[in-house]
Amino acid sequence: MAQASNSRIKVGIVGGTGYTGVELLRLLSQHPHVELTAITSRKEDGLPVADMYPNLRGRVKLAFSAPEKASLTDCDVVFFATPHGVAMAQAAELLAAGTRVIDLAADFRLQDTAVFERWYKIPHTCPDILADSVYGLVELNREAISKARVIGNPGCYPTTVLLGLAPLIEGGKQLVDVQTLIADCKSGVSGAGRKAEVGSLFSEASDNFKAYGVAGHRHQPEIVAQLEKLAGGKVGLTFVPHLVPMIRGMFSTLYARILPQARDTDFQALFEARYADEPFVDVMPAGSLPETRSVRASNNLRISVQRPGGGDQLVILVVQDNLVKGASGQAVQNMNLMFGLPESAGLDQVAILP
């Protein structure tokens, strides 16, 4: 049963030392309906959170605790900001105690376990729970999320691609050629996480711009599965991610070929109508171009609809902060829905400029 909106939700975070973990802490420490009760890290057991993240001094007074010491089953909801495979190992125990689960990794994103195992190279150990889980893209699954016990929080790239293409294909619309969709996406280096890797070292990532995962990226099957669910049939997607030398931010340029019978469609009006009531999706005025800095540290996602030369190629530009709407902010948005809270609770931060 969803907790009443006038009581405080007891929240636990598993894996609080990475970038998505500290973003959860930043957002939840300002949330009017949340009580942070447990933050786990085996390596940092006993270390005050504020000692690792000084930006949280005076905001978060908890210390990290080893997972076995944390009373996670006493929480109303537990967020997993962990590597793939961790949430599925603990979900059954939490659910049995009445604790809800929001996983920021991929354990509950793909309903096909064979596809999951092929891309993530680990067995899926709780297919029964997976079948009961909900894909947590609020703007597409709001009603199901409000009733869910387990949420698979979407990946950062899928969030931009799905929200950028949904108005064109949902409900089987015959507006664009769904077999020739292209997603050309760029992410800041924080998307790679906080672990030490050569590719995200300053001397490697700075003053450099590169594509990666062109032959196949883990987010490809996630995007395709959700696009096909929206379209009601098979879709074809070319997805190419890139790494750009900035910390936060994601810019996705999406291409869709307009079908002959849809050439007279007002696509600007279509997008504006679709997202008119969405608190975190902003369709920019015709002719405007989005920038990643306009959404930095906020839960906002901005969309621009372009039709170069009035031709048959539609170009959709989408920006978000990969750590907020692309990860932790979206997870909090899901929590709000699950517990009957205002969707924007704790998420009304204005983007940082400059």
Curated annotation (Swiss-Prot):
Enzyme Commission number, as recorded: 1.2.1.38
UniProt catalytic activity: N-acetyl-L-glutamate 5-semialdehyde + phosphate + NADP(+) = N-acetyl-L-glutamyl 5-phosphate + NADPH + H(+)
SMART domains found in the cross-reference section: Semialdhyde_dh
Subcellular location: Cytoplasm
Keyword Thylakoid in record: no
Protein name: N-acetyl-gamma-glutamyl-phosphate reductase
Pfam families xrefs: Semialdhyde_dh, Semialdhyde_dhC_1
GO cellular component: cytoplasm
Catalytic residues (positions): C156
Organism lineage string: Bacteria, Pseudomonadati, Pseudomonadota, Betaproteobacteria, Burkholderiales
PROSITE patterns: ARGC
First-tier enzyme category under EC: oxidoreductase
HAMAP family, per database record: ArgC_type1
Species name: Bordetella pertussis (strain Tohama I / ATCC BAA-589 / NCTC 13251)
Pathway: Amino-acid biosynthesis; L-arginine biosynthesis; N(2)-acetyl-L-ornithine from L-glutamate: step 3/4
Family of the protein in this entry: Belongs to the NAGSA dehydrogenase family. Type 1 subfamily.
Keyword annotations from UniProtKB, A to Z: Amino-acid biosynthesis, Arginine biosynthesis, Cytoplasm, NADP, Oxidoreductase
Keyword Cytoplasm included in the entry's annotation: yes
Highest taxon, organism lineage: Bacteria
